[in-house]
Amino acid sequence: MLTFHRIIRKGWMFLLAFLLTALLFCPTGQPAKAAAPFNGTMMQYFEWYLPDDGTLWTKVANEANNLSSLGITALWLPPAYKGTSRSDVGYGVYDLYDLGEFNQKGAVRTKYGTKAQYLQAIQAAHAAGMQVYADVVFDHKGGADGTEWVDAVEVNPSDRNQEISGTYQIQAWTKFDFPGRGNTYSSFKWRWYHFDGVDWDESRKLSRIYKFRGIGKAWDWEVDTENGNYDYLMYADLDMDHPEVVTELKSWGKWYVNTTNIDGFRLDAVKHIKFSFFPDWLSDVRSQTGKPLFTVGEYWSYDINKLHNYIMKTNGTMSLFDAPLHNKFYTASKSGGTFDMRTLMTNTLMKDQPTLAVTFVDNHDTEPGQALQSWVDPWFKPLAYAFILTRQEGYPCVFYGDYYGIPQYNIPSLKSKIDPLLIARRDYAYGTQHDYLDHSDIIGWTREGVTEKPGSGLAALITDGPGGSKWMYVGKQHAGKVFYDLTGNRSDTVTINSDGWGEFKVNGGSVSVWVPRKTTVSTIAWSITTRPWTDEFVRWTEPRLVAWP
C-alpha cells in the first residue's frame, strides 16, 4: 500500500514530468533562438619526447571530457600510422595504411597505441563534443623494405638546382612491399620511380643529396626557394608529378577519413611539397567524403611574404600555422624586457590574414633538442597564451608540452596558468575588440562581450617590463560592474564608470585578464531535495543570488 508521502511524491513527479514535457515539446509560436557563439580552441595532443608505451590514445579517451569542459574544441593528434620503428614519433612514415594493426617494424602498435585504441580515442573526443585533426605526412617515406639500383646525380645541399657530379648508379632504399600488411586496404607497392631522390647510397655508405635520373625526373616545382629548390627534405622524397603517386594518395585520403571519421588535417612540411598538390588533393578528399575537413598546413618560415604567397598559390584552401608570431614570442621572451611590444603582431598572419592563421606558442618542432628549437621562456608563456586565447584574430592551438610539461627536459606543467586563459576564451572573449597596443612594454585589449553570451566581455593586459595600468573601454553596457583578475595575479577589483571605461592594472612581467564578476542564480528555482535515507520530499530550496566566484 502506498503511504501518504509516496502518493505526494508520485504526484509531484508526474506534475514535474508534465511541465518538462510541455516546455520541451509544445510549440511557442516564437522562432528558435540562435545558438550562442563559442570560440574554437585547438590542442596539439602530443610532444616529441612522449614515452614509447602505447598509452597516448587511451589518455585521449580518458581526458576528452575534461578538455572539452575547459573549452577545447579540437584535438590535433600525432601521425597514427606505422613509422620506421615502434618508437617513431610518426614523421618517419613507413606505411600509411597501418594504424597499429599489423606486425611491421618490430611491433603491431605504434608509439601511441593500436588501431582499435586510436578509433576509440576519436569516438571519445566526438562524444565529448570535440573534433579530431589527423597529422598527414606526404613529403617522404622511410624504413624501406629493400633497395634498388637507380641512376642519380649529386646536388649542392645549398643549391639543389646545381648538379655537382656526373650520373652514376646508387643503391637507394626505395622498395616498399609492406610484407606484414600484404595487400590489405591497398595493393600499391612503392618503387624508385615514385620518388625524386634520397640522401643515402647504401652501396657506398655515402650520405649525399641525390636527385634521380629518368624520364620526367626532376625536383618538384613550385616549392619553397630556400636552398634553390626545397623539394627534398629527408628519406625517400615523393614525386608529386607521378600520376600513380597522386592517385594512391587520393585513395588513401578517402580511406583514412572513412575509416577513422576524423574531421580535418594538419599537413606536415607543405613548403617541401608541390604547391599545386594539396588544393587538388583536398578538393578530391572533401568531395569523396562529403566532409568540409578543416585543414592547417605547416609552412615553417618567419618570412610573412612566403606565407602570403603560399596562401595565394593554394587559393586559401587551408589555414597556416603562424610561425612568424611564434618567432615574435620567442624573441620577446629572450629580450629581457627590451622587446617593443607594440610590434608583437607586425608581419604575422594573425594581423594580416587572421581568418587563416592558426596561432601557437610552441610545438613539437620548437622543443629543446629539436631541429627548429626556439623554446619560448616560461615567464613569457602566460603572456603569449593570453594573446592568442583572448583576442579575436586567429584559431589558437595549445601545446601538450606546455600544458602537461616535458619530463625529458624537466619542464613543468603550465596547466594552472593556461586553464584560466582557456576559461577566459570559453566564457568571456567575445564581442567587439578595442586595442591598446600603444606602449613598448604594456599593451592591452578589451572585448565588449555579446548578449548571446551573458556575462561575457574582458580586459587584458600583458607586459614584458614593469607593471602599470591602462584606462580601457569595455562598453557602456558594463557600467557599474565590478571586474576581477581571472588569472589571480592581482587581488584588487575594477569598477567600470558610467562611460564604460576602467583603469586596469598588471604586474611586472605578467598578465592580467579582467572579467566581470557574475551575479547568477546558484540553484534551479524551486528545486526539490530529499533526505538520503528516505524517498520523501522534505523541503523546497529557494533560489538565491550569489556573487561568483
From Swiss-Prot:
Signal sequence interval, chain numbering: 1-34
Record text on cofactor binding: Binds 3 Ca(2+) ions per subunit.
Pfam families to which the protein is assigned, alphabetical: Alpha-amy_C_pro, Alpha-amylase
Active site: 268 (nucleophile), 298 (proton donor)
A GO term for molecular function: calcium ion binding
Family as reported in the entry's similarity comment: Belongs to the glycosyl hydrolase 13 family.
Name the UniProt record assigns to this protein: Alpha-amylase
Species name: Geobacillus stearothermophilus (Bacillus stearothermophilus)
